[in-house]
Amino acid sequence: MGVKNHSTVTEFLLSGLTEQAELQLPLFCLFLGIYTVTVVGNLSMISIIRLNRQLHTPMYYFLSSLSFLDFCYSSVITPKMLSGFLCRDRSISYSGCMIQLFFFCVCVISECYMLAAMACDRYVAICSPLLYRVIMSPRVCSLLVAAVFSVGFTDAVIHGGCILRLSFCGSNIIKHYFCDIVPLIKLSCSSTYIDELLIFVIGGFNMVATSLTIIISYAFILTSILRIHSKKGRCKAFSTCSSHLTAVLMFYGSLMSMYLKPASSSSLTQEKVSSVFYTTVILMLNPLIYSLRNNEVRNALMKLLRRKISLSPG
């Protein structure tokens, strides 16, 4: 017999980023712009990598996978947030909230492991360049990406199952702009000890495991770079990692400030500011960081644009 959910709440109300009426339209325009840049940037990155044979390498395979993940991630959160800026009705059904929570967990956890996989790829490329194509074969890359999404899916099932067993019999106002674990736990009228423990244990394990992988990879990378005698060679080697390192620092910084603490100790403002960074801003910046600081991507983009112009009539 399945676990019975004693919830009497059939829908939730999202409070949004702010309740000030005069800010709704400016915020709608701002986040619509961010979402547009995110979608166009990530889909463009995927297209550039797919259409240019010179970019069919392990590094760009992971980058296109990250772009796909960021596109899905932003589409889970932003459309509902945008509708909340324009509509007076900010309600979301119980099932809709659980679905959004599930896919959010899949995306945010997968993002951590994708960044760790990309760090491993850079480690092999710089520390074992002669064996790079052998170690990071297409099969290995595909298995790594599949493992990334599998871990995200498994953890989302665990968190989602724990939230489903909670009772919601009081207020149905989620003081957030999307259905996140911490605000939902605060609404529950049943014991949330297990849920808070799982957030800390599983979330802590995911962040420690992935961040340690990244730190160890970059420790070996830095050691290898320092062994390069020429300054030009060191700069070239480090330039292949700088974009990824920037993305890692931004993502993990905002994520750790949100989840690696008891839910009761976080302020509403802090939660929303942290969430805006890792659910919207960073997803927009990722394709810009990787393209603007990568000569191969810039050259491939210019090549595609010149081809489009030459094929256009007139």
From Swiss-Prot:
One of its GO terms (biological process) is G protein-coupled receptor signaling pathway. Residues 1-25, 76-99, 161-197, 259-271 are extracellular. CDD domains: 7tmA_OR8D-like. InterPro entries: GPCR_Rhodpsn (IPR000276), GPCR_Rhodpsn_7TM (IPR017452), Olfact_rcpt (IPR000725). The keyword Zinc does not apply. Residues 47-54, 121-139, 218-237, 293-314 are cytoplasmic. The keyword Oxidoreductase does not apply. Keywords: Cell membrane, Disulfide bond, G-protein coupled receptor, Glycoprotein, Membrane, Olfaction, Receptor, Sensory transduction, Transducer, Transmembrane, Transmembrane helix. Gene3D superfamilies: Rhodopsin 7-helix transmembrane proteins (1.20.1070.10). One of its GO terms (cellular component) is plasma membrane. Glycans are attached at residue 5. It is a multi-pass membrane protein. It comes from the Eukaryota. The chain crosses the membrane at residues 26-46, 55-75, 100-120, 140-160, 198-217, 238-258, 272-292. It is found in: Cell membrane. Belongs to the G-protein coupled receptor 1 family. PANTHER family: OLFACTORY RECEPTOR. Odorant receptor. This is Olfactory receptor 8D4. It comes from Homo sapiens. The lineage of its organism: Eukaryota, Metazoa, Chordata, Craniata, Vertebrata.
